């Protein structure tokens, strides 16, 4: 299986609850390496650009408002089958449907404020990583 990279975002609700370390522990315990990370407060324009594919959806305005409501932590995760592994760790989008032991089951309260975002495919991961990180900001891990 090939080494992959995926984008992960710890959303404002989880940052506000001081869950960054707990979520990072989940990534690392699953064998994912954090090869790029930054904390930032998205502008409205940044959030609209990142979620542009949802622009015509009824939840778009609320999503942009939520994602700009406080700081987020954005990271690049690397590992074998990283996209699927991260999605398994996150759990279902709706925390009420997420399996016990997943990030969303343990830390999220609603489908709108669901703690984390993760790329859904290797193609979207590449696009999402480049939205937040330059090549120089992603480290090569050798150990």
Swiss-Prot record:
- Enzyme class, top EC level, equals transferase
- Any one Gene Ontology molecular-function term assigned to this protein's record: metal ion binding
Give the chief site where it resides.
cytoplasm
For this entry, list what GO says about its biological process. Answer: CTP biosynthetic process; GTP biosynthetic process; UTP biosynthetic process
Query: Where is it localised?
Result: Cytoplasm
Instruction: Locate the residues binding ATP.
Output: 11, 59, 87, 93, 104, 114
**Cytoplasm found in the keyword field:** yes
Q: Which residues, by range, are in coiled-coil regions?
A: none
Which HAMAP family does the record match to this protein?
A: NDP_kinase
Give the similarity note: Belongs to the NDK family.
Function statement: Major role in the synthesis of nucleoside triphosphates other than ATP. The ATP gamma phosphate is transferred to the NDP beta phosphate via a ping-pong mechanism, using a phosphorylated active-site intermediate.
Its name, as the record gives it, is Nucleoside diphosphate kinase
């Amino acid at each position: 299986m090939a080494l992959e990279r995926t984008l992960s975002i710890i959303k404002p609700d989880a940052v506000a609850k001081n869950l960054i370390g707990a979520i990072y522990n989940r990534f690392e315990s699953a064998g994912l390496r954090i090869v790029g990370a930054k904390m930032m407060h998205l502008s409205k324009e940044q959030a609209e650009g990142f979620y542009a594919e949802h622009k015509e959806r009824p939840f778009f305005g609320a999503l942009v408002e939520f994602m700009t409501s406080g700081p987020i932590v954005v990271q690049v995760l690397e590992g074998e089958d990283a996209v699927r592994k991260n999605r398994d760790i996150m759990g279902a989008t709706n925390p009420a449907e997420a399996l016990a032991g997943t990030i969303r089951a343990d830390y999220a309260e609603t489908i709108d404020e669901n703690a984390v975002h993760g790329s859904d495919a290797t193609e979207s991961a590449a696009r999402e990583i480049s939205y937040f990180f330059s090549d120089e900001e992603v480290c090569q891990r050798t150990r």
